[in-house]
Swiss-Prot record:
Species this protein is from: Thermococcus gammatolerans (strain DSM 15229 / JCM 11827 / EJ3)
Domain GATase cobBQ-type residue range list: 247-433
InterPro entries: Class_I_gatase-like, CobQ/CobB/MinD/ParA_Nub-bd_dom, CobQ_GATase1, CobQ_N, CobQ_synth, GATase_3, P-loop_NTPase
Biological process according to GO: cobalamin biosynthetic process
Pfam family, one: CbiA
Pathway noted in the entry: Cofactor biosynthesis; adenosylcobalamin biosynthesis
PANTHER family found in the cross-reference section: COBYRIC ACID SYNTHASE, DETHIOBIOTIN SYNTHETASE
Cleaved signal peptide residues: none
Role summary: Catalyzes amidations at positions B, D, E, and G on adenosylcobyrinic A,C-diamide. NH(2) groups are provided by glutamine, and one molecule of ATP is hydrogenolyzed for each amidation.
Identification of the protein by name: Probable cobyric acid synthase
Keywords from the named record: Cobalamin biosynthesis, Glutamine amidotransferase
Active site: 325 (nucleophile), 425
């Protein structure tokens, strides 16, 4: 039977996801057979698993850090918010329904928790170490009785716990004390120490706080991780991207149900992006409509709030328009939807020659494709699809050459006048394509072509893991785990 280590946080955004990612790589580098686990995640950023299911991007990244193929077992329950206090429930990678928060808490949660714990038990049997990520804070008084992602998991797994806090926000010592005081004695006993994340400054200034924590709780500070710029996606971190107007003004519309905005991280690093919330702001060189958890409702929101007219006017004035997944569907001529919104046929924005019909079966696949858009024609790209819709266009953006490694020949996406749309999430992580796309626009604007910096998720994981390893007591953690 393997061991379990759980990372809890004093709040959302404390650094749990990335600390788990780093620990996964650290223990993998030490030769341990390690896997990640999060019983329940609420996120609009998802990715395909090896089984053809859907998991959170955080556990997808952690699987890569473990050198494992991403599996639905690493994130059995995924909640995808739909608005109006409702979420789509995905269990073991497949949608099983849409419920209100109250109904979920009262009806489905316990059943799914039992099933998720069975998955966790199986992971412990098969691997040396399972590193578990908690969710939000483990001691929210109004939610504790319904919480199936934190201390109940830790106690079930007989895991050792690490409590991480974001010191960059301020109040980290108070947050740790408050969390520890609200934990039950048996929960507090599982905590082996504390980690302070995103610290800037002289670490010695924190010593009085460390001494206080050790004296009060008998538990050490295991590490202080310096604040560092990195390119690893932080879960649901849209707010982390400031408005940046580079030499090209790239605007992304912040839809009410925006999903998979990790698609645009390469654009952020290569040029800068501007997330737009008002239609009068739409005057960029590029306007992007991102993916959406509820395509038709977001299309109607664009229409009712003046964005549709602003997009058409900006396009007429020379803006290049791009749609990714749901954004592509919105830019087409029409959508027939009896699945997500059940509104039937809805007129699209009409900038792309495409028609979309929603189907009940969700496609969740890794794709290899060849681009047909003229400035990058013939270029090989890869990405993934997570969608209900099937679109038809006489001018496809690309041809899918392989689905999950199996050869195929399937047109996808659409090309319009100064516009394209694609189902390929991760298209801009193909750096050769992104460089070609940006330079096409730069030359149009009278700017010199540039070479954009290449980087890989693998390199970023290794770099961040090394930083964490240098700043936490790995030997002590190993000792506590009995490894």
């Amino acid at each position: 039977m393997g061991k379990a280590l759980m990372v809890l946080g004093t709040s959302s955004g404390a650094g749990k996801s990335l600390l788990v990612t780093a620990l996964c790589r650290i223990f993998s580098n030490l030769g341990y057979d390690v896997v990640p686990f999060k019983s329940q995640n609420m996120s609009l950023n998802s990715a395909p698993s090896i089984e053809g299911g859907e998991i959170s991007r955080a556990q997808y990244l952690q699987a890569i850090a473990c050198r494992k193929k991403p599996s639905v077992r690493f994130n059995p329950i995924l909640l995808k918010p739909e608005g109006n206090m409702r979420s789509q429930v995905i269990f073991m990678g497949k949608p099983i329904g849409s419920v209100s928060a109250k109904d979920y808490m009262l009806s489905r949660k316990e059943e799914l928790f039992r099933k998720a714990m069975k998955v966790l038990d199986e992971l412990k049997e098969r691997h040396d170490l399972v590193i578990i990520e908690g969710a939000g804070s483990p001691v929210e008084i109004n939610l504790k009785d319904y919480d199936i992602a934190n201390t109940r998991v830790m106690l079930h797994a007989k895991a050792k716990g690490i409590l991480v806090t974001d010191i960059d926000r301020g109040g980290s010592f108070a947050s740790i004390v408050g969390t520890m005081e609200l934990l039950k004695p048996e929960e507090r006993d599982t905590i082996i120490g504390f980690v302070f994340n995103k610290f800037r400054g002289d670490k010695s200034l924190l010593e009085p706080g460390f001494e206080y924590l050790e004296k009060r709780y008998g538990k050490p500070t295991l590490g202080v991780i310096p604040y560092v710029e990195h390119r690893l996606p932080e879960e649901d971190s849209l707010a982390e991207f400031p408005k940046v107007k580079g030499e090209l003004h790239i605007q992304i519309i912040k839809l009410p149900h925006i999903s998979n905005f990790t698609d645009f991280e390469p654009l952020h690093w290569a040029n800068g992006v501007d997330y737009v919330t008002r239609p009068e702001e739409l005057k960029g060189d590029v306007i992007i409509i991102p993916g959406s958890k509820n395509t038709v409702e977001d299309l109607l929101w664009l229409r009712e709030n003046g964005f549709e007219d602003a997009i058409i006017e900006a396009h007429r004035e020379g803006s290049f328009v791009v749609g990714i997944c749901g954004g592509f569907q919105m830019l087409g001529e029409k959508i027939i939807d009896t699945v997500e919104s059940k509104r039937g046929e809805v007129k699209g924005i009409g900038l792309l020659p495409a028609k979309t019909v929603f189907e009940k079966t969700k496609r969740t696949n890794h794709l290899n494709a060849e681009v047909l858009w003229e400035p990058a024609r013939g270029m090989a790209v890869e990405g993934y699809e997570i969608r209900f819709g099937r679109s038809v266009s006489e001018r496809p953006f690309s041809v899918i050459k392989a689905i999950n490694g199996a050869k195929t020949f399937e047109p996808e996406g659409a090309i319009g006048e100064r516009a394209f749309g694609t189902y390929l999430h991760g298209i801009f992580h193909n750096f050769a394509f992104t460089e070609r796309f940006l330079n096409f626009l730069r030359v149009e604007k009278g700017l010199e072509p540039v070479s954009i910096e290449r980087w890989s998720i693998e390199e970023e994981i290794e770099r961040f893991a090394k930083l964490v390893e240098e700043n936490i007591d790995v030997e002590r953690i190993l000792g506590e785990l009995g490894l």
